[in-house]
Regions:
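Short, well-ordered coil/turn elements that cap or connect secondary structure elements
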Residues: 35-36, 72-74
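Conserved short beta-strand edge segments in small beta-sheet-based binding/regulatory domains
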Residues: 73-85
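Small, basic N-terminal interaction modules of short regulatory proteins
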Residues: 54
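Short amphipathic alpha-helices in soluble, non-transmembrane regions
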Residues: 24-27, 62-72
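Short S/T/G/P-rich N-terminal loop/turn motif that feeds into the first structured element of a domain
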Residues: 1-41, 45-50, 58-60, 83, ...
Length: 127
């Protein structure tokens, strides 16, 4: 992929039989590797082990590492450049745009209406 400043979605499924803990650790190692670009977002899957990562790819070196699976060697990996998320800020803007345009709600409104669920780790971080 030629570098054209934009975010990419990396979709990664661990090999059959890999324990969830190991899959989570390997995905986190991939996310933590700053050589791959700016890690904008990631999450892990329930059920099939693996996860997804959004990277803001800003250089030829970062782009080249999209072909290097690193700790995800042996995984089913697919990389998809995103249309409107041209940077980390663009990814955040696209999130807000989608909520507001397709559901008529702002992220701040959703945050204000959330209950005190102990699973909501992001509420502990902002307290």
């Amino acid at each position: 992929m030629a570098v054209s400043r934009r975010c990419v979605l990396v979709y990664a499924l661990a090999p059959e039989g890999m324990p969830a803990r190991e899959a989570n650790d390997r995905l986190n190692e991939y996310v933590a590797d700053s050589r791959r670009g700016l890690s904008v977002w990631h999450d892990h899957f329930i059920g099939a082990h693996g996860g997804a990562v959004v990277l803001d790819v800003r250089s030829e070196e970062e782009c080249a590492l999209l072909d290097d699976r690193g700790p995800l060697e042996g995984w089913d990996l697919s990389v998809h450049p995103l249309t409107f998320s041209l940077s980390a800020v663009g990814f955040a803007a696209q999130t807000s745009f989608t909520l507001e345009s397709y559901r008529g709600v702002r992220l701040e409104e959703l945050a204000a209406a959330e209950t005190d669920d102990p699973r909501f780790w992001w509420r502990r971080r902002s307290a």
